[in-house]
Amino acid sequence: PDWPTLTVIQHGRDAHAPEIQAANIDRRHGYLSEDELLELQNACMFHVCPSLSEGWGHYIVEALSVGAVVLTVAAPPMDELVTRERGLLVPYERVGEQRLTSTYYFSAAGLQAAVDRAVAMSDDEWARMSANARQWFQSNRNDFPLRVRSALLESVQ
């Protein structure tokens, strides 16, 4: 589609996926240095994180930390990290299993609709969602030591 450039970072077994030929896809193979990754994370207004499942969602939280508006699957735990106030949720069309976890397969039409909405988003709406993403990250990071302390105290009582 006629969308802005999509930067795709792949490593490991995913790096051998079939090459998609499109002028607006910048596909990066292999691991990036920390500086390269930080530069890309901060340069992109939107981060597309279409995970089938997540343990905690590190790359989603990294996206929120830079104030990116995240597009991710409307399933746990992704939708616990990204809400409508700080991102765009993509519906899933089926659920599978991988060992002891559920996998959520996003709807291609839903992802296209979310990208279309992101592209059409006003500067004010993006700025509000971006600020909400960054604020959530800062609050989560600042409250983490207290939550750990509380959990540890509860576990020894």
Model-derived segments and spans:
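C-terminal "capping" alpha-helix adjacent to the active site of nucleotide-linked donor transferases
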Residues: 94-127
